[in-house]
Amino acid sequence: MAAAKHFTYVILGGGVAAGYAAREFAKQGVKPGELAIISKESVAPYERPALSKGYLFPQNAARLPGFHTCVGSGGERLLPEWYSEKGIELILSTEIVKADLASKTLTSSADATFTYDTLLIATGSSVIKLTDFGVQGAEANDILYLRDIEDADKLVAAMQAKKDGKAVIVGGGYIGLELSAALKTNNFDVTMVYPEPWCMPRLFTSGLAAFYEGYYANKGIHIIKGTVAVGFDADANGDVTAVKLKNGNVLEADIVIVGVGGRPLTHLFKGQVAEEKGGIKTDAFFETSVPGVYAIADVAAFPMKLYNEIRRVEHVDHARKSAEQAVKAIKAKEAGESVPEYDYLPYFYSRSFDLSWQFYGDNVGEDVLFGDNDPTAAKPKFGSYWIKDGKVVGVFLEGGSAEENQVIAKVARAQPPVADVEALKKEGLDFAAKV
């Protein structure tokens, strides 16, 4: 076996967080040969949200190298050449199958070994597949998932092969809503199926969801709620032809896209680090219970200062910010200095069709819907406040300008008191503007 390759710093994972961590290391003056990124993917880190949005456009679709990190936040695009110039080693198409934190050694599926002084775990999440639950027929062709660029390429190929066909989207969350819009824009006949009483149940109230379901229905998307896919039919070639639902219905399908959630990829570290909330427990600097080992983005269960509790956040904004925080903390520690604790304000957003919403804060407590949430409105603009213990703790806004979105973020952070809920409903966005 070849000798282990040693690096001062290793980032394990090649997603959004890896790209932002590499940029921060470069800013902090990392020396050539000190840093490596080890990734299962075959390309340099890229902005993952593009896969469910621009990548699927019928015209002028986004393609690499156009959306390598860090363009998603208005930063420099880090092409593979950038890593070479900085002396950062990109070790791609490499799957790590064993991590021994005691000996600071990583082993790949090809039996290559890598050692490090400091490790950043940025392994992200894997998609939950219907085959994991033994759903009958779930291994048929053109039952697709979306997590990485390889998945996106399979989806694009299927869309071209099954042009103007029937698409069934299983799941009513982020991926379900964004991909239903993408497939409809590509002239597919689209049906969404999900078990919950409304879409995006982890964030949306029934009032918010009613707008999006109405809007999608007006676009010709069929929505079937309160049931799940229990089986699939395929033709002699193994291509999917139908989706069988628990309620007895059978839907014709040329393509099925499944978006039923993800699981943080922490299995390599089981029994070696403290865990919480399904992730790897860290402090406010993203250091784990093992000194010199950090966990960022999807896998980190970190102290959310604003709400005084440990949380895990699966979102690109947190992936970027946690990566930067961890690298700053690593370099500060080496210099005998300190950095402020991570103080994250939860943020989610989505764009589909002509719609664009943003949410900041916490969606707990009483919700107060404001504005016009008529799905037939030419330019819909509405939102919701969440009130807990007499204070605004979360704000959602559809159709906001950049300035208005900044205002709602400020409100979610400031948590102003609310004396009169009815007055708040009438004031709507004006309340936020006064904070």
Swiss-Prot record:
Gene induction: Induced by cold stress. Induced during senescence.
Positions of NAD(+) binding: 172-178, 196, 202, 261, 314-315, 349
Binding site for FAD: 14-17, 41, 48, 53, 96, 147-148, 298, 316, 349
Cellular component terms per the entry's GO annotation: cytoplasm
Protein name per UniProt: Monodehydroascorbate reductase 4, cytosolic
Binding-site positions, NADP(+): 174-178, 202, 261, 314-315, 349
GO molecular function, one term: monodehydroascorbate reductase (NADH) activity
A Pfam family it matches: Pyr_redox_2
Keywords tagged on the record: Cytoplasm, FAD, Flavoprotein, NAD, NADP, Oxidoreductase, Redox-active center
Tissues of expression: Expressed in anthers.
Reaction equation(s) it catalyzes: 2 monodehydro-L-ascorbate radical + NADH + H(+) = 2 L-ascorbate + NAD(+)
Naturally occurring in which organism (per UniProt): Oryza sativa subsp. japonica (Rice)
Compartments in which it is found: Cytoplasm
Primary enzyme class: oxidoreductase
